[in-house]
Amino acid sequence: MRWIKVMAGLLPMIGSKGADEKDSSQQRRLSRVVVPEHYDLHVKILDAGFCGSVGIRVMISQDVSEIVLNAKELEIRDAGIVVEGARIPGRVVVGEAEKELEVVRIVFPSSLRAGPGYLTMEFCGDYNNGLVGLYKSGGPKEVYSTHFEPTDARWVFPCFDQPDMKATFKISIDAGSKFTVLANTQAIPSLREEYGDRKIEYFEETCKMSTYLVAFVVGELSYIEDWSKDGVRLRVYGDSSEVEWGRYGLEVGKRCLEYFSEYFGVGYEFPRAGSAKIDMVGIPNFSSGAMENWGLITFRRESLLYVPGKSNVEDMKNVAETVCHELGHMWFGNLVTMSWWDDLWLNEGFATWVSFKGMENIGSVVSWDVWGEFVLWNVVRGMVDDGLGKSHQIRMNVTDPGEIGEIFDSISYCKGASVIRMIERYVGESVFMLGIRRYIKEHMYGNGNAMSLWKAIGEEYGEDISEMVEGWISQAGYPVVSVQDCGSSLVLSQSRYSMLGKSDDSLWTIPVVVSWEGKGQERIELRGRETTVRKRSSVYKVNAEYGGFYRVLYDSAGLSGLESRIDSLSVVDRVNVIEDVFGLGFGLYGGLEHGLRRISEYYSDSYHVARSGIEKLLRLRSVFYDDAEIVSLIDKKVRKMILPCVGRIDVFDIGTSVESVSMNKYVLSVGVEVGIREAVEKVQELWRRHVEAGEELGELRWIVYKAVVDENLGYMMDKYKNGDTPGMRREVMNGFSGIKREENFLDVVGNLSQFSVEDIGVVIGSISRGGAFRDAMVEYVVSHGEELYLMVHKNAMLYNMIIMSLRHVSGDLIVEKVERFLSGIKHSGSNLSIEKVRNEIQWRRRMRGIREEVLRGLLPEAEK
């Protein structure tokens, strides 16, 4: 499942009781006394809800008196089991204890003997309003679709809803004749049944797979298609008015599938060679970025559809990354699945990393600095979130429904991907690839875990790497490596990094790579608290190419030498210097005043370097948002840095490459934010030409919206509802951060129900990040918390987006209100989000305590 960059239901050991088993109702995981081998699943799509039947071929390993499986808010009847040709009826038990555990008990009149059986039952349910299970999407034409990850298949049919209980599936869907019906595998036309205005589609049997990957979609859909060189059919499905917008995603998908088939050493053959297919469907309402259902990938529309000439470069990047991410899951997640959700990071971290590997290797359809993007959106983000106090380890023990959804976060995705990249650089690309191939071939159609992966890579590397890697995934946080220049040698020492001043005795085996000027690179393993290395040149950079997930604290000699060569550093190395200097300054390790004085020298017209540097100043601006003096000084410094670039920008011809477009857009947006008159005038002129002559806003749409929202809120709401690109809704919501009129603020927050359920948290977050109504937005959330929880239909991930909007405040009074609100939240699945908000606010208040140091760093020398 792809996380959206604006970014997250679940399990107690319960099981079928044998004669000698103790009651295990207080445990969350199903026992393995009864395991599924095959499902025959039939679902009938009706206007008001759905009904169906399921037959499950099971293997019983010991005598049992009941079978326990997962179900949630389903009406279940006519349960029974066929054993040795005779059907034994079962009594359906769903009491309060079962509801709490999200299970159903099928109790039999006498014990069932160990051996095979065929469990059957019928069920009915309602469509889910929370974008999980089986739900209806709005729009001109309704679409019925499923979303089962992590534990939401149980909303739709009784099942053994755990990733380690794989089985094959035969699916049939009864729906209206006008609908296209899709499932994981191809439909079998010769088996189609038609009656009245309805039809039943039967689908080929799947390979063994987990329940969370089962999917079906029903709607009035059209498609475009292509074929990979290995004969895999790829299609993009969507509304007939939009499906042509899938051409870019289709091309990316085809090329990426071909590359991954080579990289993994195993071709894509789901469900089998000769009938392998991948359908990609844009769903009108969707909570995440996409979902990797095997053979039937579902997407948020803007993560799949790209409109040439109207969509922007961010849309293009998003489509490419999301498609590659989901295709990576076809091997890592689907073909080989984590045994349990504590290794979720292995699915998501790997898919995140390999999506960039894919984009790097699919030719001209991706024409930007892929690894520069990776560093900004994964390494940097992972370090910021993991450095804030009570983070969690990458591999986190989860049991409760609610906990699993919470770990779909930046630690699992961003840090997980960054650690995988670090390991690849440590053992080498070819060795790492061979290890991955070994792991996949050993666990195909089954389950694996992190230890199995390290073992496979270690066998190719010729050395056990598990001890080194385990330290990175089994403990929270990451190290800061201090570098002391002793003349002829360097002393490297490690301690845990913390933005809150809370260190501990954690130790990592750190694969340090040092780049020596004129001498190449040297690999060093820092295993203990410190080590000494011979100095090879006077200028050096520790953590070459930003390959490791750690910060580097240089002494004055080391940093001075590095700064003297700043212009010769690669983009990612230059970003690394900025991130370390300010990351350590923000953690009060010292050097913030120095960094603020030198930031203009670190800056360059490279998009990734410019963004890294400016974002540090804007983050400080956000901390001191109610301090007019600090805000004024930051704005002045930013204006001086970007003014030359702003002057060169032509808003009617924003750039000729993805790099130049990204840079010009970013600088222009910041210029408007900090009040550069020329930037504001250019944006206003583009808006005037748009209104008077129909000039396309194009790449600058959201920047223009932010600048003109107060005078044009009605226009923007119309674009939200009737936009002509899939990404326009997001651009409108980003534009809300520019609201400065109280009546507009009240209009938006007073009518949140007009937004799609998945967008409510995005709207709130956009306004809370803006300057004018930051505190007011937070006041609204803390006074309407329960109402908002119901508004997003108790979807924990969507509600957590709302909770996270509270982290942008610093003042005493508003912080007290936030804390009272957080203390009162009792809903399952928000504990990690609550801690993240508390930690962010604690850091902000800690930073406000060093105001004088910040002031000294911002003031010109003559004024100090």
Swiss-Prot record:
<dbReference type="GO" id="GO:0005737">
    <property type="term" value="C:cytoplasm"/>
</dbReference>
<feature type="binding site">
    <location>
        <position position="325"/>
    </location>
    <ligand>
        <name>Zn(2+)</name>
    </ligand>
</feature>
<dbReference type="InterPro" id="IPR034016">
    <property type="entry name" value="M1_APN-typ"/>
</dbReference>
<dbReference type="InterPro" id="IPR042097">
    <property type="entry name" value="Aminopeptidase_N-like_N_sf"/>
</dbReference>
<keyword id="KW-0378">Hydrolase</keyword>
<dbReference type="GO" id="GO:0006508">
    <property type="term" value="P:proteolysis"/>
</dbReference>
<dbReference type="GO" id="GO:0070006">
    <property type="term" value="F:metalloaminopeptidase activity"/>
</dbReference>
<feature type="binding site">
    <location>
        <position position="329"/>
    </location>
    <ligand>
        <name>Zn(2+)</name>
    </ligand>
</feature>
<keyword id="KW-0482">Metalloprotease</keyword>
<keyword id="KW-0645">Protease</keyword>
<feature type="active site" description="Proton acceptor">
    <location>
        <position position="326"/>
    </location>
</feature>
<feature type="binding site">
    <location>
        <position position="149"/>
    </location>
    <ligand>
        <name>substrate</name>
    </ligand>
</feature>
<dbReference type="GO" id="GO:0043171">
    <property type="term" value="P:peptide catabolic process"/>
</dbReference>
<dbReference type="InterPro" id="IPR050344">
    <property type="entry name" value="Peptidase_M1_aminopeptidases"/>
</dbReference>
<dbReference type="InterPro" id="IPR024571">
    <property type="entry name" value="ERAP1-like_C_dom"/>
</dbReference>
<feature type="binding site">
    <location>
        <position position="348"/>
    </location>
    <ligand>
        <name>Zn(2+)</name>
    </ligand>
</feature>
<dbReference type="Pfam" id="PF01433">
    <property type="entry name" value="Peptidase_M1"/>
</dbReference>
<dbReference type="GO" id="GO:0042277">
    <property type="term" value="F:peptide binding"/>
</dbReference>
<dbReference type="InterPro" id="IPR014782">
    <property type="entry name" value="Peptidase_M1_dom"/>
</dbReference>
<dbReference type="InterPro" id="IPR045357">
    <property type="entry name" value="Aminopeptidase_N-like_N"/>
</dbReference>
<dbReference type="Pfam" id="PF11838">
    <property type="entry name" value="ERAP1_C"/>
</dbReference>
<protein>
    <recommendedName>
        <fullName>Probable M1 family aminopeptidase 2</fullName>
        <ecNumber>3.4.11.-</ecNumber>
    </recommendedName>
</protein>
<keyword id="KW-0862">Zinc</keyword>
<feature type="binding site">
    <location>
        <begin position="289"/>
        <end position="293"/>
    </location>
    <ligand>
        <name>substrate</name>
    </ligand>
</feature>
<dbReference type="GO" id="GO:0005615">
    <property type="term" value="C:extracellular space"/>
</dbReference>
<keyword id="KW-0031">Aminopeptidase</keyword>
<dbReference type="Pfam" id="PF17900">
    <property type="entry name" value="Peptidase_M1_N"/>
</dbReference>
<comment type="similarity">
    <text>Belongs to the peptidase M1 family.</text>
</comment>
<keyword id="KW-0479">Metal-binding</keyword>
<dbReference type="InterPro" id="IPR001930">
    <property type="entry name" value="Peptidase_M1"/>
</dbReference>
<dbReference type="InterPro" id="IPR027268">
    <property type="entry name" value="Peptidase_M4/M1_CTD_sf"/>
</dbReference>
<feature type="site" description="Transition state stabilizer">
    <location>
        <position position="413"/>
    </location>
</feature>
<dbReference type="GO" id="GO:0008270">
    <property type="term" value="F:zinc ion binding"/>
</dbReference>
<dbReference type="GO" id="GO:0016020">
    <property type="term" value="C:membrane"/>
</dbReference>
